[in-house]
Amino acid sequence: MAEIPEGANVTILNRNEKKARELISKLGLKKVPGIIRVTFRKKDNQIFAIEKPEVFRSVGGNYVVFGEAKVDNFTQRLAAAQQQAQSQTATKTPEDIQADMQAAAVANENKTEGDAAEEDVDAGDLSNDDIDLVVQQTNATKGQAIKALKEHNGDIVNAIMSLSK
């Protein structure tokens, strides 16, 4: 018997799986590369997951999946993620929290100064109703609404669309 080198990836197939693979090769199924995980969901939201599956596809669009199916407990993974997020926020010191709050306040002040500069835009021949409509629909500032209306020659729809992007 030949020796298997260290670090080699060896898969031992049972008898039923060997037979199934032989039948698949006779049916002409094509192997689908690049699939990392397959999940199946039942009506009661129970999830079965197959990690590193071998997936084959028939001409008609049906799939055959080989691999070890495990019951995936989504609630446990969600609880672990929440616990990890809480531990990350708990590690902040009061000084870090104060620094974050001051940085947010400075950013907010800079934003309001920029908004005040935009308010000085000349409305020209645009009606206040058109400007107010664009502001209401897009939650933009009055200056942004006037600028968009001028860019689109007073077309309200195009101004709203440009600000909604």
UniProtKB/Swiss-Prot annotation:
GO terms for biological process: cotranslational protein targeting to membrane; protein transport. InterPro entries: EGD2/NACA0like, NAC-like_UBA, NAC_A/B_dom_sf, Nas_poly-pep-assoc_cplx_dom, UBA-like_sf. GO terms for cellular component: extracellular region; fungal biofilm matrix; nascent polypeptide-associated complex; nucleus. It holds the Pfam family NAC. Residues 14-78 form the NAC-A/B domain. Residues 126-165 form the UBA domain. Keywords: Cytoplasm, Nucleus, Protein transport, Transport. The keyword Transmembrane does not apply. It comes from the Eukaryota. Its main location: cytoplasm. One of its GO terms (molecular function) is unfolded protein binding. It is found in: Cytoplasm; Nucleus. PANTHER family: NASCENT POLYPEPTIDE ASSOCIATED COMPLEX ALPHA SUBUNIT-RELATED. Part of the nascent polypeptide-associated complex (NAC), consisting of EGD2 and EGD1. NAC associates with ribosomes via EGD1. Belongs to the NAC-alpha family. Component of the nascent polypeptide-associated complex (NAC), a dynamic component of the ribosomal exit tunnel, protecting the emerging polypeptides from interaction with other cytoplasmic proteins to ensure appropriate nascent protein targeting. The NAC complex also promotes mitochondrial protein import by enhancing productive ribosome interactions with the outer mitochondrial membrane and blocks the inappropriate interaction of ribosomes translating non-secretory nascent polypeptides with translocation sites in the membrane of the endoplasmic reticulum. This is Nascent polypeptide-associated complex subunit alpha.
